[in-house]
Amino acid sequence: MPHPLFDKHRATLDAAVKAIHERTYWAAYAEMPSPKVYGETAMDDGKRAFDRCLGQQFALDQPGQTAWMSSEQSPYGFALEISYPVCKGQALIDAGLQAMPGWQKIGAEGRTGICLEILERLNKRSFELAHAVMMTSGQGWMMAFQAGAPHAQDRALEAVAYAWREQSFV
């Protein structure tokens, strides 16, 4: 079933599937935090976005929430004071089961397109993710950027490409 997000990201998916088929290296997401790639203000924008999370609730619209939990301490010596929702596991499972018919209805192209759009949006927030990884793991800046953003995004893309390839056989 055609889907606009699948069409939007088709070139990226095709390149990833080609790399899988040829068993070659290919990366969609730049591992160097270059302003030429990510934008001149990406570093400062990402830091500000991360800083806005400090001392706040990490609000997620999900069912079964019973409380907020906040006990994270940065390895760099300060309390992050970011609160995360605590949910009843069964409520989350039930919501997933309820969503399943919609995911089935949009077909493999729809599911793949949505996953690729998620990766594109995450990539645009790579500097924010890098600051979060750095401040929660203790990794240095470059490692936090590469491991927490483009490398993770490339591995996710690889998984999406494998899933698409297998579903396309059906």
Regions found by a protein language model. Give the residues of each.
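Long amphipathic alpha-helix in the N-terminal Rossmann-like dinucleotide-binding domain
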Residues: 90, 94, 112-127, 139-170
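Short, structured beta/alpha segment
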Residues: 1-135
